[in-house]
């Protein structure tokens, strides 16, 4: 696969699971002879939700919840066919969303 790069974008709510999956992908790619750029940490998306604590009164009493989405970016430069096969067979954690672009 001459001159072609694989860009992998990972998303997860838990950064520990995300980092473990990233390490697993990097070690698999390096083991098969590909060059890896990254992991590059992308900005964390924070969604905040504000709700009333009570159902009817006390508008001043509110509670805030937040949801953090952590992201990482990996570039695999000049992947070998063995690299592609190993990445296809790789089993990652359930809470990690993987987007792959060629």
From Swiss-Prot:
Keyword Ribonucleoprotein attributed: yes
Keyword terms: Ribonucleoprotein, Ribosomal protein
Source superkingdom: Bacteria
Pfam family, one: Ribosomal_S10
BP GO terms, sorted: translation
Molecular functions (GO terms): structural constituent of ribosome; tRNA binding
Cystines in this chain: none
GO cellular component: ribonucleoprotein complex; ribosome
PANTHER family with a match to the protein in the record: 30S RIBOSOMAL PROTEIN S10 FAMILY MEMBER (PTHR11700)
Function: Involved in the binding of tRNA to the ribosomes.
Assembly behavior: Part of the 30S ribosomal subunit.
Stated family: Belongs to the universal ribosomal protein uS10 family.
NCBIfam families for the chain: PRK00596.1 (NF001861), rpsJ_bact (TIGR01049)
Name the record gives this protein: Small ribosomal subunit protein uS10
The species this protein was found in: Chelativorans sp. (strain BNC1)
């Amino acid at each position: 696969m001459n001159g072609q790069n694989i860009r992998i974008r990972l998303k997860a709510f838990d950064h520990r699971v995300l980092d473990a999956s990233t390490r697993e992908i990097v070690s698999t790619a390096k083991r098969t002879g590909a060059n890896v750029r990254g992991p590059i940490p992308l900005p964390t998306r924070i969604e905040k939700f504000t709700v009333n604590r009570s159902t009817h009164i006390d508008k001043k009493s509110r509670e805030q919840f937040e949801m953090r989405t952590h992201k990482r970016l990996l570039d695999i430069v000049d992947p070998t066919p063995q690299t592609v096969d190993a990445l296809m067979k790789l089993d990652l954690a359930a809470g990690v969303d993987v987007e792959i672009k060629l």
